[in-house]
Amino acid sequence: MRHILVTAFRNTSAELLVRGISDSDILLLPNDKVLDSEKLISTLSNRKYDSIISIGQRPNIKDKVHVETMAREGLLSIGTTFDCDMLVRLFEEAGIQAKLSCNAGTSYCNCLYFYGLRYLREKQPEAQMVFVHVPFQKNITDFEHFRRQFLRVIAYIQNQ
C-alpha cells in the first residue's frame, strides 16, 4: 500500500470531495498563497510520502477533471513525474471525464503545485506529486456519484 497525502483547499468542492478518504493523510489548506505552500512543505519535511495528490477547483469546467502536468513560476516550469496518463485513464474508467492540462492556473493552485514540485525535486525525488482540478460543486451534476468515483480512483492509487 502506498503512503499518500491528499491536499485540498478549505471551503471548496475539493474539500467536499476528499471527505471520507481512508488510509491516506489529508491536509486541508487555508486558501492563502504563502501559507498553503508553507503548510505543504512543513508536512512533507516531517513525513515521507510516495505520492501527493493535490486537489483544487477550477470554475470553467463541468463534470470533469483536469490532470495538471506542470506548474509555472515566471519563466520557470516544473513537470510532474506522476503518471498523468494513467490517472486520466483511471478517472475515465470510473466514469469521470478527464483530460491532461499544462495550465495549473496563475494563483493558489499553481503556486502550491510549483513549490510542492520544487521541494520534492530537491529533497524527496522519489516522491511524486500531481494536481487535479475539479469543478465547482454547482458544476457537478451528481455530486455524490462524482465523489464516490473520485474516491475510488484515490483508493486504487493507494493500493498500487
Name the predicted role of every residue range.
Residues 1-106, 117-128, 144-148, 157-159:
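N-terminal catalytic or cofactor-binding beta/alpha core of small enzyme domains
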Residues 112-116:
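Buried hydrophobic packing segments
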Residues 138-142:
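Short active-site-adjacent structural elements
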